[in-house]
Design a protein with these regions (language model features):
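Gram-negative bacterial Sec-dependent N-terminal signal peptides
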Residues: 1-19
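Conserved, mostly hydrophobic/aromatic
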Residues: 54, 109, 150, 180, ...
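Glycan-recognition patch characteristic of GH18 chitinases/ENGases
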Residues: 21-140, 305-306, 312, 318-323, ...
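Solvent-exposed loop/turn segments at secondary-structure junctions
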Residues: 31-35, 58-63, 113-118, 147, ...
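Extracellular low-complexity, Gly/Ser/Thr-rich intrinsically disordered linkers
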Residues: 333-417
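Surface-exposed amphipathic alpha-helices with a cationic face
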Residues: 22-25, 91-108, 112-113, 174-191, ...
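Generic structural signal for well-ordered alpha-helices
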Residues: 92-96, 133-140, 170-181, 207, ...
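Substrate-binding surface in catalytic domains of secreted glycosidases
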Residues: 65-86, 155-322
């Protein structure tokens, strides 16, 4: 297919995706591979009647990064191709059964995730991009997928030094997406997930260049607090519980406006909703500049909780020395239904999210975690409609509690299978 005719019609093709249906609800399912969400879930327990698109997560990339810990990804003969674990392969083979629940369901393979290595190398040259793209085409064809989703966290930034990156990533990502679209044409969906950080639409991804190449973009409008005592996904700023550092003054609305200012059209934008919370590991430290690539390497100098609270969380299975990601179903089970009632529930009417507090040894009210519930999800759905966005995305199916949040989202967006 010739390049110019394809690129000329792409804006029309991509814009039609959101308008052809009412709204989108893109559900990520952690089948395996994400380093924070834990082991992959059971695909046989999925109820996909509440969504329009399923992003199966994750495929990973064979790479030569020195920090790679997965031995299976180090095969030099497979470098830059997409790796699927045995479980992921088994799950993808079961998709025909899953589709019977929802014949209109679109299923994409999501490649990447937090801490996933290999993107910078795979996107670096025409040759490496060709290897990656051929691998993607083979997987999409083999499993009858509807497209591919790239979750590169993050070009240029490298997850604050966690994975390899380079300044050329921004342009190379554009080239990768351009060539990926050329390879798939209009027959398959090509989508990406992008971060909430203010630098993302400014210097990590070239929004104006990539938008015409994509069917839609999933905004990861969560993880606002970086593990500190603030909301994970506040819709707006809170007056009752203000941030300490200006660098942490993020909100969902702030992120949406940043991408709009960068040139992304609202009808190509899915608002991300996180079905989880994070317990604070440290106090906000105004001295840390999170726009710098090495920010993650800053030492933790001011723990938020005292010994009593640390011991409490440890007794609940949460180690504050590690990642403090807590799924919504565990929040319901462990925090909201705590028989000892050690946590107090709150609703912040500025931020439009619920949160929990715990008392310190001195009786001070401390921020335990924020999360989403049916009320906050419904409010975010209303925001999606008012702003004219394409729909919603959520991470992830296995974190929901009896499909409460997915069902609320579908109801609020008037999505039916």
């Amino acid at each position: 297919m010739k390049r110019l005719p394809l690129l000329a019609v792409l804006p029309l093709l991509c814009a039609s995706v959101a308008s052809a249906s009412s709204m989108m609800s893109v559900g990520y399912f952690n089948g395996g591979g994400d380093v924070t969400a834990g082991p992959g879930g059971d695909i046989n327990k999925l109820d996909v009647r509440q969504i329009t698109h399923l992003n199966y997560s994750f495929g990973l990339i064979y790479n030569g990064e020195k920090e790679e810990t997965n031995v299976a990804l180090k095969d030099p003969a497979m470098r830059h191709q997409i790796w699927l674990s045995p479980k992921v392969q088994s799950d993808l083979a079961q998709l025909p059964v899953l589709r019977k629940q929802n014949p209109n369901l679109k299923v994409l393979l999501s490649v990447g995730g937090w801490g996933a290595r290999g993107f910078s190398g795979a996107a670096a040259t025409p040759e490496t991009r060709a290897v990656f793209i051929q691998s993607a085409q083979e997987i999409v064809k083999k499993y009858g997928l509807d497209g591919i989703d790239l979750d590169w966290e993050y070009p240029v930034n490298g997850a604050w030094g966690l994975v390899e990156s380079q300044p050329a990533d921004r342009d190379n990502f554009t080239l990768l997406l351009k060539e990926l679209r050329q390879a798939f044409g209009k027959a398959k969906l090509v989508t990406i997930a992008v971060g909430a950080n203010a630098e993302s639409p400014k210097s990590w991804v070239d929004v104006k260049a990539i938008a015409p190449l994509l069917d839609y973009i999933n905004l990861m409008t969560y993880d606002m607090a970086y593990g500190t005592q603030y909301f994970n996904a506040n819709l707006y700023d809170s007056k009752a519980w203000p941030t300490v550092a200006a660098a942490d003054k993020y909100s969902v609305d702030f992120v949406v406006n940043n991408y709009l200012a960068a040139g992304l059209k609202p009808q190509q934008m899915n608002l991300g909703i996180g079905f989880y919370g994070r317990v604070p590991k440290r106090s906000v430290e105004p001295g840390i500049d999170w726009s710098k690539p090495d920010a993650q390497k800053n030492p933790v100098t001011q723990p938020y909780f005292g010994e009593q609270e640390v011991a409490l969380f440890r007794s609940l299975g949460i180690d504050l020395k590690k990642d403090t990601y807590v799924k919504y179903n565990d929040i319901v089970k462990t925090f909201l239904n705590d028989p000892q009632k050690r946590f107090t529930g709150h609703w912040d009417d500025d931020a439009k999210v619920p949160w929990l507090s715990v008392k310190s040894a001195e009786g001070k009210t401390l921020f335990a975690l924020s999360y989403e519930d049916p009320r906050s999800v419904a409010i975010k759905a209303d925001y999606i409609k008012k702003r004219g966005l394409a729909g919603a995305m959520f991470w992830e199916y296995g974190a929901d509690d009896n499909n409460q949040l997915a069902k609320q989202l579908a109801e609020s967006l008037a999505i039916t299978p």
